[in-house]
Amino acid sequence: WMQGWDYGFIFDSTVNDFVSGELEKSIVVCYKEKNPDFIIIEGQAALRNPSGPCGGEFLISCSVDGVVLQHSPKRKYYDGWEHVGALMPSLASEVALIEAYGRRVVAIALTTSKMSEKEMHGYKKSISKELNIPVFLPLEEGVLELAEILKKLRDDN
């Protein structure tokens, strides 16, 4: 019902009081009907996005086993909030915030818009070293290694 997907709901038009219940319902129905190996939950914005922070519901109500965090290293401000100087927090602090919710960041996927190949690989290497978390360039290198991480996470749980 949602552009070809059987499970989910329109997050942006759901009153916040009902978001957790809608998330839980979508996951339970999907699990009962399909019994999938994975349920991938596409996140929304960021935990500290000034236009509407969200994500806590996804982390807690969905009881996620791991987070693949999307990061845009060249972005300085939240999109659309440059005029008020809404700086993006550091990646390390975002990882720490997710961990404060009791969830683990299992990988980081980089948005490589406006980056040279040298910059892409430089960010990949430095972030992986700093945070000791696997970093991926999904558009440039694919996601096979990431899929292996997710399979291991599934098998360990």
Identify the meaning behind each predicted range.
Residues 1-157:
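Flexible phosphate-sensing "switch/lid" loops adjacent to ATP/NTP-binding sites
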